[in-house]
C-alpha cells in the first residue's frame, strides 16, 4: 500500500506514463503473488522458520532502494524486492498463526488477516504525513519500522523453531478428504476466478485513481 500511495510522487519525479505505472503494479504483484505458492510448496516440505525475518529483509532492501531510486528501473527493482518479501513472509507466517491459535484456527487467521488489512490502510495515511510533503526520500523512515519488525520476527522464528523440533518426531495425522477430486478442483477453480476478478479491479482502481 505504501508504493501505491506514492504513485503521484513517482509519476511527477520520473514523468511516468500510465503504462509505466502499470508496470510497477505488475512487477509488485508478480513478485508477491506468483512466487508465494512456490514458497508455500517448498516450506510445506521443508519448514523454514527463519523465512519470517528473511522476508522482511527483502522488504527492507526494497524500501531503501525505493528511497534512493534515481531511475524507473530502480523503482521496478524496489517493487520486486518488496513483493518478494511478501512472498517469502506470508506462507510461514500463516503457519505460525495456526500454530499459535490453540485450536481456534478461524479466529487466529481472522486476526492475522485484520492485522494485514490494518497495515494496508495505515500505509497511505503515513505516506501522506511523512512522504508526500517532503519527497520519496522520506521512504527511508519506514526502514526503521522494518528493522523493528525483523527483531520481533527473529524472536517468533526462535519460538517456531523450538515448536518444530518438539513436533518433529510425532506422527502426522492422516487427512481423509471425503470429496471427489473433480469437485475439489472445481471449487478451487471458482475461488481462484473470484479472487482474480476482485484483485483485477482493486489493482486497476488503486493504480490509476
Question: At which residue positions do the language-model features occur?
Answer:
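Extracytoplasmic gate region of multi-pass secondary transporters
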Residues: 3-4, 186-209
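Residue-level signature of mid-helix packing/kink "hotspots" within the transmembrane helices
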Residues: 29-37, 120-121
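Conserved MFS/SLC helix-loop-helix module at the cytosolic interface between two early adjacent transmembrane helices
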Residues: 34-72
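Short hydrophobic/alpha-helical segments at membrane-entry points of transmembrane helices
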Residues: 73-79, 191
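Cytoplasmic helix-loop-helix junction between adjacent transmembrane helices
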Residues: 78-115
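Helix-loop-helix hairpin linking two adjacent transmembrane segments in secondary transporters
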Residues: 112-159
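Flexible cytoplasmic inter-helical loops of multi-pass small-molecule transporters
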Residues: 155-179
Amino acid at each position: 500500500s505504501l508504493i501505491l500511495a506514492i504513485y503521484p510522487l513517482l509519476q511527477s519525479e520520473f514523468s511516468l506514463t500510465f503504462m509505466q505505472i502499470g508496470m510497477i503494479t505488475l512487477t509488485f504483484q508478480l513478485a508477491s503473488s506468483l512466487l508465494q505458492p512456490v514458497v508455500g510448496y517448498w516450506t510445506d516440505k521443508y519448514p523454514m522458520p527463519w523465512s519470517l525475518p528473511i522476508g522482511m529483509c527483502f522488504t527492507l532492501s526494497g524500501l531503501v532502494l525505493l528511497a534512493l531510486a534515481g531511475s524507473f528501473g530502480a523503482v521496478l527493482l524496489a517493487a520486486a524486492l518488496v513483493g518478494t518479501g511478501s512472498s517469502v513472509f506470508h506462507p510461514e507466517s500463516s503457519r505460525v498463526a495456526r500454530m499459535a491459535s490453540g485450536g481456534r484456527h478461524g479466529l487466529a487467521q481472522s486476526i492475522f488477516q485484520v492485522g494485514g488489512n490494518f497495515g494496508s490502510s495505515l500505509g497511505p495515511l503515513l505516506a501522506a504525513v511523512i512522504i508526500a510533503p517532503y519527497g520519496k526520500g522520506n521512504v527511508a523512515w519506514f526502514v526503521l519500522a522494518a528493522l523493528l519488525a525483523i527483531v520481533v520476527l527473529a524472536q517468533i522464528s526462535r519460538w517456531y523453531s523450538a515448536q518444530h523440533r518438539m513436533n518433529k518426531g510425532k506422527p502426522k495425522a492422516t487427512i481423509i478428504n471425503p470429496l471427489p477430486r473433480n469437485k475439489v478442483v472445481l471449487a478451487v477453480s471458482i475461488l481462484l476466478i473470484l479472487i482474480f476478478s476482485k484483485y483485477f479491479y482493486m489493482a486497476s482502481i488503486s493504480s490509476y485513481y
